[in-house]
Curated annotation (Swiss-Prot):
The presence of a 'disulfide through disulfide knot' structurally defines this protein as a knottin. The keyword Cytoplasm does not apply. Keywords: Cytolysis, Disulfide bond, Knottin, Plant defense. Disulfide bonds join C5-C19, C9-C21, C14-C26. Probably participates in a plant defense mechanism (Potential). Binds to and induces leakage in phospholipd membranes, particularly ones containing 1-palmitoyl-2-oleophosphatidylethanolamine (POPE). In vitro, displays cytotoxicity against cultured cells but no hemolytic activity towards fresh erythrocytes. One of its GO terms (biological process) is killing of cells of another organism. This is Cyclotide mech-2. Belongs to the cyclotide family. Moebius subfamily. Pfam families: Cyclotide.
Length: 29
């Protein structure tokens, strides 16, 4: 699967640097 950032999107954004929201999961760029 895709490398995730270990975080879910909050208000469509991710707090982890260089991560992008693909709701509801944050993925590495």
């Amino acid at each position: 699967g895709l490398p995730t950032c270990g975080e879910t999107c909050t208000l469509g954004k991710c707090n982890t640097p260089k991560c992008t929201c693909n709701w509801p999961i944050c993925y590495k760029d």
